[in-house]
Protein backbone atom coordinates (compact mmCIF):
# COMPACT_ATOMS: atom_id res chain seq x y z
CA UNK A 1 0.00 0.00 0.00
CA UNK A 2 1.17 3.49 -0.76
CA UNK A 3 0.10 6.44 1.32
CA UNK A 4 -0.86 9.77 -0.22
CA UNK A 5 2.21 11.32 1.36
CA UNK A 6 4.47 8.95 -0.54
CA UNK A 7 3.46 9.77 -4.10
CA UNK A 8 6.68 11.75 -4.55
CA UNK A 9 8.67 8.60 -3.81
CA UNK A 10 7.58 6.78 -6.96
CA UNK A 11 10.29 5.89 -9.42
CA UNK A 12 9.90 4.36 -12.90
CA UNK A 13 11.35 0.91 -13.45
CA UNK A 14 13.01 1.79 -16.75
CA UNK A 15 15.98 3.68 -15.33
CA UNK A 16 19.49 2.43 -15.97
CA UNK A 17 20.90 0.83 -12.84
CA UNK A 18 23.72 3.05 -11.68
CA UNK A 19 25.13 3.74 -8.28
CA UNK A 20 25.55 7.35 -7.18
CA UNK A 21 28.70 7.61 -5.08
CA UNK A 22 28.83 9.74 -1.95
CA UNK A 23 31.59 10.62 0.44
CA UNK A 24 30.61 10.30 4.05
CA UNK A 25 32.03 12.43 6.83
CA UNK A 26 30.73 10.83 10.01
CA UNK A 27 30.91 12.38 13.45
CA UNK A 28 31.05 9.21 15.53
CA UNK A 29 30.33 11.07 18.76
CA UNK A 30 26.96 12.40 17.64
CA UNK A 31 26.18 9.57 15.21
CA UNK A 32 25.30 12.16 12.59
CA UNK A 33 26.69 12.17 9.07
CA UNK A 34 27.26 14.81 6.38
CA UNK A 35 27.19 13.79 2.75
CA UNK A 36 28.74 15.31 -0.38
CA UNK A 37 27.70 14.08 -3.83
CA UNK A 38 30.57 12.68 -5.86
CA UNK A 39 28.57 11.32 -8.82
CA UNK A 40 30.74 8.27 -9.36
CA UNK A 41 30.69 4.56 -8.62
CA UNK A 42 31.95 3.59 -5.17
CA UNK A 43 35.46 2.16 -5.18
CA UNK A 44 34.57 -0.41 -2.53
CA UNK A 45 31.45 -2.53 -2.86
CA UNK A 46 30.50 -4.14 0.45
CA UNK A 47 28.79 -6.94 -1.45
CA UNK A 48 32.12 -8.12 -2.81
CA UNK A 49 33.13 -9.14 0.72
CA UNK A 50 30.14 -11.45 0.98
CA UNK A 51 29.38 -12.44 4.56
CA UNK A 52 32.95 -13.11 5.66
CA UNK A 53 32.01 -11.77 9.09
CA UNK A 54 28.59 -12.16 10.66
CA UNK A 55 27.69 -10.41 13.90
CA UNK A 56 26.11 -12.33 16.74
CA UNK A 57 22.47 -11.63 17.54
CA UNK A 58 23.60 -10.04 20.82
CA UNK A 59 25.95 -7.68 18.94
CA UNK A 60 23.18 -6.70 16.54
CA UNK A 61 20.77 -6.04 19.41
CA UNK A 62 23.37 -3.95 21.26
CA UNK A 63 23.93 -1.89 18.12
CA UNK A 64 20.19 -1.27 17.76
CA UNK A 65 19.76 -0.31 21.41
CA UNK A 66 22.56 2.25 21.12
CA UNK A 67 20.87 3.90 18.15
CA UNK A 68 17.20 4.05 19.22
CA UNK A 69 15.93 7.43 17.96
CA UNK A 70 14.15 9.98 20.12
CA UNK A 71 10.52 10.89 19.49
CA UNK A 72 8.64 14.17 19.54
CA UNK A 73 5.60 14.61 21.78
CA UNK A 74 1.99 15.58 21.25
CA UNK A 75 -0.97 16.37 23.47
CA UNK A 76 -4.02 14.19 22.91
CA UNK A 77 -7.42 13.70 24.51
CA UNK A 78 -7.37 11.32 27.46
CA UNK A 79 -9.93 8.99 25.89
CA UNK A 80 -7.60 8.46 22.88
CA UNK A 81 -4.48 7.69 24.90
CA UNK A 82 -4.75 3.91 25.42
CA UNK A 83 -1.43 2.19 24.61
CA UNK A 84 0.37 5.49 24.06
CA UNK A 85 3.57 6.31 25.95
CA UNK A 86 3.37 9.06 28.55
CA UNK A 87 5.89 11.81 27.82
CA UNK A 88 5.95 13.37 31.28
CA UNK A 89 5.19 12.33 34.83
CA UNK A 90 1.78 13.18 36.28
CA UNK A 91 1.25 14.22 39.89
CA UNK A 92 -2.20 14.53 41.41
CA UNK A 93 -3.22 18.01 42.47
CA UNK A 94 -6.24 16.77 44.41
CA UNK A 95 -7.30 14.22 46.99
CA UNK A 96 -9.39 11.30 45.78
CA UNK A 97 -11.87 11.13 47.32
CA UNK A 98 -12.02 14.77 48.34
CA UNK A 99 -14.37 14.19 51.28
CA UNK A 100 -15.39 11.62 53.87
CA UNK A 101 -17.91 9.21 52.36
CA UNK A 102 -19.99 6.21 53.28
CA UNK A 103 -18.71 2.93 51.86
CA UNK A 104 -21.88 0.89 52.46
CA UNK A 105 -25.63 1.36 52.19
CA UNK A 106 -26.71 1.77 55.80
CA UNK A 107 -26.87 4.36 58.56
CA UNK A 108 -24.38 7.06 59.53
CA UNK A 109 -24.12 7.30 63.31
CA UNK A 110 -21.76 8.40 66.08
CA UNK A 111 -19.55 5.58 67.39
CA UNK A 112 -19.75 7.00 70.91
CA UNK A 113 -23.52 6.31 70.96
CA UNK A 114 -22.90 2.58 70.48
CA UNK A 115 -20.20 2.05 73.05
CA UNK A 116 -22.44 0.10 75.44
CA UNK A 117 -24.66 -1.61 72.87
CA UNK A 118 -25.22 -5.35 73.43
CA UNK A 119 -27.73 -8.10 72.69
CA UNK A 120 -29.24 -7.71 76.15
CA UNK A 121 -29.18 -3.91 76.10
CA UNK A 122 -29.40 -2.70 72.48
CA UNK A 123 -29.17 0.98 71.60
CA UNK A 124 -32.11 2.64 69.85
CA UNK A 125 -31.36 5.56 67.47
CA UNK A 126 -33.86 7.81 65.71
CA UNK A 127 -33.51 8.15 61.91
CA UNK A 128 -33.70 11.89 61.14
CA UNK A 129 -32.89 12.07 57.43
CA UNK A 130 -31.33 10.65 54.29
CA UNK A 131 -28.13 11.50 52.39
CA UNK A 132 -27.40 10.62 48.75
CA UNK A 133 -24.26 10.69 46.56
CA UNK A 134 -23.45 14.22 45.45
CA UNK A 135 -25.82 15.80 47.99
CA UNK A 136 -24.19 16.56 51.36
CA UNK A 137 -26.15 16.60 54.61
CA UNK A 138 -25.29 20.00 56.04
CA UNK A 139 -26.55 19.70 59.62
CA UNK A 140 -24.31 18.06 62.25
CA UNK A 141 -25.43 14.64 63.42
CA UNK A 142 -26.72 14.86 66.99
CA UNK A 143 -26.21 12.23 69.65
CA UNK A 144 -28.64 9.26 69.52
CA UNK A 145 -29.62 10.14 65.93
CA UNK A 146 -28.93 8.25 62.70
CA UNK A 147 -29.02 9.27 59.03
CA UNK A 148 -29.76 6.78 56.25
CA UNK A 149 -26.77 6.91 53.85
CA UNK A 150 -26.14 5.48 50.38
CA UNK A 151 -22.79 4.12 49.19
CA UNK A 152 -20.56 6.99 48.09
CA UNK A 153 -22.61 9.71 49.77
CA UNK A 154 -20.82 12.35 51.91
CA UNK A 155 -20.73 11.60 55.62
CA UNK A 156 -22.72 14.07 57.73
CA UNK A 157 -20.73 16.26 60.13
CA UNK A 158 -20.09 14.46 63.46
CA UNK A 159 -20.97 11.06 61.92
CA UNK A 160 -17.99 8.70 62.11
CA UNK A 161 -19.42 5.22 61.50
CA UNK A 162 -21.64 3.55 58.89
CA UNK A 163 -23.66 0.55 60.06
CA UNK A 164 -24.74 -1.64 57.12
CA UNK A 165 -28.49 -2.13 56.68
CA UNK A 166 -28.19 -5.84 57.46
CA UNK A 167 -26.62 -5.13 60.88
CA UNK A 168 -29.58 -3.20 62.32
CA UNK A 169 -33.23 -3.87 63.13
CA UNK A 170 -35.72 -1.32 61.80
CA UNK A 171 -38.64 -0.13 63.95
CA UNK A 172 -40.63 2.60 62.21
CA UNK A 173 -38.34 5.67 62.27
CA UNK A 174 -35.80 4.02 64.56
CA UNK A 175 -32.96 1.51 64.27
CA UNK A 176 -31.92 -0.95 66.94
CA UNK A 177 -28.20 -1.71 67.24
CA UNK A 178 -27.02 -4.58 69.45
CA UNK A 179 -23.22 -4.27 69.24
CA UNK A 180 -20.59 -1.51 69.35
CA UNK A 181 -18.83 -0.39 66.15
CA UNK A 182 -15.28 0.97 65.88
CA UNK A 183 -14.81 4.57 64.84
CA UNK A 184 -14.25 4.91 61.08
CA UNK A 185 -15.90 1.59 60.16
CA UNK A 186 -17.14 1.71 56.53
CA UNK A 187 -16.08 5.36 56.16
CA UNK A 188 -13.83 6.41 53.27
CA UNK A 189 -11.35 9.17 54.10
CA UNK A 190 -10.14 12.10 51.94
CA UNK A 191 -7.11 11.06 49.86
CA UNK A 192 -7.67 7.40 50.71
CA UNK A 193 -7.23 6.41 47.06
CA UNK A 194 -4.94 9.21 45.88
CA UNK A 195 -3.47 11.93 48.07
CA UNK A 196 -2.72 15.35 46.63
CA UNK A 197 0.96 15.49 45.61
CA UNK A 198 1.21 11.77 44.80
CA UNK A 199 3.11 10.76 41.66
CA UNK A 200 0.42 8.71 39.90
CA UNK A 201 2.11 7.88 36.57
CA UNK A 202 5.79 8.05 35.60
CA UNK A 203 7.08 9.26 32.26
CA UNK A 204 7.58 6.41 29.81
CA UNK A 205 4.58 4.44 30.99
CA UNK A 206 2.41 2.76 28.39
CA UNK A 207 -1.07 3.98 29.24
CA UNK A 208 -3.64 1.34 30.22
CA UNK A 209 -7.44 1.67 30.57
CA UNK A 210 -7.22 1.81 34.38
CA UNK A 211 -4.66 4.62 34.07
CA UNK A 212 -7.16 6.58 32.00
CA UNK A 213 -9.80 6.10 34.67
CA UNK A 214 -7.46 7.32 37.40
CA UNK A 215 -6.32 10.36 35.41
CA UNK A 216 -9.92 11.30 34.79
CA UNK A 217 -10.64 10.98 38.52
CA UNK A 218 -7.99 13.61 39.32
CA UNK A 219 -9.36 16.02 36.74
CA UNK A 220 -7.11 15.39 33.73
CA UNK A 221 -8.70 15.32 30.27
CA UNK A 222 -5.60 15.43 28.01
CA UNK A 223 -2.08 14.00 28.25
CA UNK A 224 1.31 14.64 26.68
CA UNK A 225 2.47 11.47 24.92
CA UNK A 226 5.31 10.42 22.66
CA UNK A 227 4.39 10.53 19.00
CA UNK A 228 4.06 7.11 17.43
CA UNK A 229 7.31 6.11 15.73
CA UNK A 230 6.94 6.73 12.00
CA UNK A 231 8.03 3.68 10.03
CA UNK A 232 8.52 3.82 6.26
CA UNK A 233 8.32 0.51 4.44
CA UNK A 234 10.27 -0.01 1.22
CA UNK A 235 9.70 -3.26 -0.67
CA UNK A 236 12.22 -3.95 -3.43
CA UNK A 237 12.15 -6.41 -6.29
CA UNK A 238 11.59 -6.28 -10.04
CA UNK A 239 9.96 -9.70 -9.77
CA UNK A 240 7.17 -8.59 -7.43
CA UNK A 241 3.48 -8.16 -8.19
CA UNK A 242 1.30 -5.96 -5.93
CA UNK A 243 -0.02 -7.57 -2.76
CA UNK A 244 -3.15 -9.61 -3.34
CA UNK A 245 -2.50 -10.05 -7.06
CA UNK A 246 -2.63 -13.65 -8.35
CA UNK A 247 0.91 -14.76 -9.26
CA UNK A 248 1.62 -15.27 -12.96
CA UNK A 249 4.44 -16.05 -15.36
CA UNK A 250 7.75 -15.83 -13.50
CA UNK A 251 6.57 -13.15 -11.08
CA UNK A 252 5.71 -13.58 -7.40
CA UNK A 253 3.14 -11.72 -5.35
CA UNK A 254 4.32 -9.40 -2.59
CA UNK A 255 3.65 -11.14 0.74
CA UNK A 256 6.05 -9.14 2.90
CA UNK A 257 4.47 -5.68 2.65
CA UNK A 258 1.07 -6.55 4.13
CA UNK A 259 2.71 -8.81 6.71
CA UNK A 260 5.16 -6.10 7.81
CA UNK A 261 2.49 -3.40 7.90
CA UNK A 262 0.44 -5.60 10.22
CA UNK A 263 3.46 -6.28 12.44
CA UNK A 264 4.37 -2.59 12.65
CA UNK A 265 0.83 -1.65 13.67
CA UNK A 266 0.76 -4.47 16.21
CA UNK A 267 3.87 -3.02 17.83
CA UNK A 268 2.42 0.50 17.90
CA UNK A 269 4.16 2.11 14.93
CA UNK A 270 2.66 4.44 12.33
CA UNK A 271 3.43 2.94 8.94
CA UNK A 272 3.71 4.49 5.50
CA UNK A 273 4.77 2.66 2.37
CA UNK A 274 6.73 3.47 -0.76
CA UNK A 275 5.04 0.53 -2.44
CA UNK A 276 7.10 -1.82 -4.58
CA UNK A 277 10.35 -0.08 -5.51
CA UNK A 278 12.37 -1.48 -8.44
CA UNK A 279 15.88 -2.82 -7.94
CA UNK A 280 17.37 0.50 -8.96
CA UNK A 281 19.73 2.48 -6.69
CA UNK A 282 18.23 5.87 -7.55
CA UNK A 283 14.69 4.68 -6.89
CA UNK A 284 15.68 3.10 -3.59
CA UNK A 285 17.61 6.18 -2.52
CA UNK A 286 14.63 8.39 -3.32
CA UNK A 287 12.43 6.20 -1.12
CA UNK A 288 14.94 6.69 1.71
CA UNK A 289 14.09 10.40 1.91
CA UNK A 290 10.83 9.89 3.82
CA UNK A 291 10.67 11.97 7.02
CA UNK A 292 10.44 9.14 9.54
CA UNK A 293 12.30 7.65 12.49
CA UNK A 294 12.66 4.13 11.08
CA UNK A 295 13.01 2.69 7.58
CA UNK A 296 12.41 -0.99 6.91
CA UNK A 297 13.54 -2.38 3.57
CA UNK A 298 12.20 -5.74 2.49
CA UNK A 299 14.41 -7.53 -0.03
CA UNK A 300 17.77 -6.64 -1.53
CA UNK A 301 19.64 -7.11 1.75
CA UNK A 302 22.11 -9.78 0.68
CA UNK A 303 25.15 -9.73 -1.63
CA UNK A 304 23.63 -10.46 -5.05
CA UNK A 305 24.08 -8.21 -8.09
CA UNK A 306 20.61 -6.72 -7.58
CA UNK A 307 21.02 -6.31 -3.81
CA UNK A 308 21.82 -2.60 -3.91
CA UNK A 309 20.60 -1.60 -0.46
CA UNK A 310 23.64 -2.57 1.67
CA UNK A 311 25.98 -0.65 -0.63
CA UNK A 312 23.66 2.37 -0.73
CA UNK A 313 23.51 2.45 3.05
CA UNK A 314 27.29 1.99 3.37
CA UNK A 315 27.95 4.96 1.06
CA UNK A 316 25.13 7.30 2.04
CA UNK A 317 25.06 6.61 5.76
CA UNK A 318 26.38 3.89 8.01
CA UNK A 319 26.03 0.13 7.58
CA UNK A 320 26.60 -0.94 11.17
CA UNK A 321 25.59 -4.60 10.85
CA UNK A 322 25.50 -6.77 7.72
CA UNK A 323 24.98 -10.45 8.28
CA UNK A 324 23.93 -12.06 11.56
CA UNK A 325 24.66 -15.53 12.94
CA UNK A 326 21.11 -16.82 12.87
CA UNK A 327 18.86 -18.98 10.71
CA UNK A 328 16.78 -17.81 8.97
CA UNK A 329 17.45 -14.05 8.51
CA UNK A 330 21.23 -14.24 8.30
CA UNK A 331 21.39 -11.53 5.55
CA UNK A 332 19.87 -8.91 7.88
CA UNK A 333 21.44 -5.45 7.74
CA UNK A 334 21.13 -2.57 10.20
CA UNK A 335 22.36 0.97 9.82
CA UNK A 336 21.73 4.70 9.85
CA UNK A 337 20.62 7.00 7.03
CA UNK A 338 20.83 10.62 8.21
CA UNK A 339 18.74 10.45 11.40
CA UNK A 340 16.81 7.34 10.41
CA UNK A 341 17.38 3.88 11.86
CA UNK A 342 17.35 1.47 8.90
CA UNK A 343 16.64 -2.26 8.87
CA UNK A 344 17.41 -4.39 5.82
CA UNK A 345 15.27 -7.51 5.93
CA UNK A 346 15.62 -10.48 3.58
CA UNK A 347 13.04 -10.97 0.85
CA UNK A 348 12.21 -14.55 1.81
CA UNK A 349 9.01 -14.22 3.88
CA UNK A 350 9.98 -16.32 6.91
CA UNK A 351 13.37 -14.60 7.06
CA UNK A 352 11.56 -11.29 6.84
CA UNK A 353 9.18 -12.24 9.67
CA UNK A 354 12.01 -13.48 11.89
CA UNK A 355 14.24 -10.48 11.15
CA UNK A 356 11.41 -8.10 11.97
CA UNK A 357 10.57 -9.73 15.30
CA UNK A 358 14.17 -9.90 16.51
CA UNK A 359 15.46 -6.56 15.25
CA UNK A 360 13.14 -3.97 13.66
CA UNK A 361 10.21 -4.89 15.90
CA UNK A 362 12.43 -4.63 18.96
CA UNK A 363 13.19 -0.97 18.19
CA UNK A 364 9.53 -0.14 17.57
CA UNK A 365 8.37 -1.96 20.70
CA UNK A 366 10.90 -0.09 22.84
CA UNK A 367 9.77 3.24 21.39
CA UNK A 368 6.10 2.44 22.05
CA UNK A 369 6.57 1.30 25.65
CA UNK A 370 5.99 -2.36 24.90
CA UNK A 371 9.48 -3.37 25.94
CA UNK A 372 12.18 -5.24 24.07
CA UNK A 373 10.86 -8.77 24.66
CA UNK A 374 9.28 -10.78 21.87
CA UNK A 375 5.54 -10.00 21.90
CA UNK A 376 4.39 -13.60 22.19
CA UNK A 377 3.04 -15.70 25.03
CA UNK A 378 5.54 -18.29 26.24
CA UNK A 379 5.04 -21.91 27.26
CA UNK A 380 7.53 -24.49 28.53
CA UNK A 381 7.08 -27.90 26.91
CA UNK A 382 9.16 -31.01 26.13
CA UNK A 383 10.50 -31.75 22.67
CA UNK A 384 8.85 -34.61 20.86
CA UNK A 385 11.89 -34.98 18.59
CA UNK A 386 15.49 -33.82 18.42
CA UNK A 387 16.36 -30.51 16.76
CA UNK A 388 19.69 -30.12 15.01
CA UNK A 389 21.63 -26.87 15.04
CA UNK A 390 25.24 -25.73 15.20
CA UNK A 391 27.04 -23.93 17.99
CA UNK A 392 27.56 -20.23 17.35
CA UNK A 393 24.28 -19.77 15.46
CA UNK A 394 20.84 -18.87 16.79
CA UNK A 395 18.04 -20.85 15.13
CA UNK A 396 14.38 -19.87 14.83
CA UNK A 397 12.41 -23.12 14.40
CA UNK A 398 8.69 -23.15 13.56
CA UNK A 399 6.93 -25.79 15.66
CA UNK A 400 3.62 -27.47 16.33
CA UNK A 401 2.34 -28.70 19.69
CA UNK A 402 0.87 -32.19 19.53
CA UNK A 403 -0.25 -34.03 22.67
CA UNK A 404 1.79 -31.65 24.80
CA UNK A 405 5.01 -32.17 22.87
CA UNK A 406 6.88 -29.91 20.46
CA UNK A 407 7.72 -30.98 16.92
CA UNK A 408 9.06 -29.14 13.89
CA UNK A 409 6.82 -27.94 11.09
CA UNK A 410 8.24 -29.15 7.79
CA UNK A 411 9.58 -27.89 5.49
CA UNK A 412 11.61 -25.27 7.38
CA UNK A 413 12.83 -23.23 4.39
CA UNK A 414 13.14 -19.44 4.65
CA UNK A 415 10.72 -19.03 1.74
CA UNK A 416 8.08 -21.37 3.20
CA UNK A 417 5.62 -18.90 4.74
CA UNK A 418 2.93 -21.59 5.02
CA UNK A 419 5.15 -23.25 7.65
CA UNK A 420 4.64 -20.20 9.90
CA UNK A 421 0.89 -20.28 9.22
CA UNK A 422 0.66 -23.95 10.21
CA UNK A 423 2.90 -23.44 13.24
CA UNK A 424 1.65 -22.90 16.78
CA UNK A 425 4.78 -20.90 17.47
CA UNK A 426 8.54 -21.13 17.35
CA UNK A 427 11.50 -22.28 19.41
CA UNK A 428 14.75 -20.32 19.60
CA UNK A 429 17.85 -22.49 19.80
CA UNK A 430 20.61 -20.43 21.38
CA UNK A 431 24.15 -20.15 20.04
CA UNK A 432 25.44 -22.12 23.03
CA UNK A 433 22.90 -24.94 22.90
CA UNK A 434 23.81 -26.58 19.63
CA UNK A 435 21.41 -29.48 19.01
CA UNK A 436 18.48 -30.25 21.33
CA UNK A 437 17.50 -33.76 22.38
CA UNK A 438 14.09 -35.44 22.47
CA UNK A 439 12.40 -34.77 25.81
CA UNK A 440 14.41 -31.63 26.52
CA UNK A 441 12.31 -28.76 27.89
CA UNK A 442 12.12 -25.72 25.62
CA UNK A 443 10.37 -22.36 25.58
CA UNK A 444 7.79 -22.09 22.82
CA UNK A 445 6.91 -18.57 21.70
CA UNK A 446 3.28 -18.98 20.71
CA UNK A 447 1.96 -17.07 17.70
CA UNK A 448 -0.56 -15.24 19.83
CA UNK A 449 -0.25 -12.00 21.82
CA UNK A 450 0.87 -11.89 25.43
Which stretches of residues belong to each language-model region?
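Intrinsic-disorder-associated, low-complexity terminal segments enriched in Asp/Asn/His/Tyr and depleted
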Residues: 6-8, 17, 27
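Flexible glycine/proline-rich
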Residues: 61, 74-83, 88, 134, ...
Amino acid sequence: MQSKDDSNLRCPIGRVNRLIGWSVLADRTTKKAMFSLRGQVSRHDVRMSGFAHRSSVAEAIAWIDSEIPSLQTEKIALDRSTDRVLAQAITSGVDVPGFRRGMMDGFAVRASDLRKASESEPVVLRVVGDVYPGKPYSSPLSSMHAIRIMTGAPMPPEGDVVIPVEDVRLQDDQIVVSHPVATGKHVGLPGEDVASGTLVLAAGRRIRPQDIGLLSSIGIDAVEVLCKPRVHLITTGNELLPAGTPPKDFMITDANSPMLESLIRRDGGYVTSAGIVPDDPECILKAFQAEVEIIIVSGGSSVGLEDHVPQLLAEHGELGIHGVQMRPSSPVGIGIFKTRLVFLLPGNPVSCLCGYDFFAGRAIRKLTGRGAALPYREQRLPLGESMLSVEGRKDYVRVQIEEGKVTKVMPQGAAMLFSAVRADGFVVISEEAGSLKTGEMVTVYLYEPR
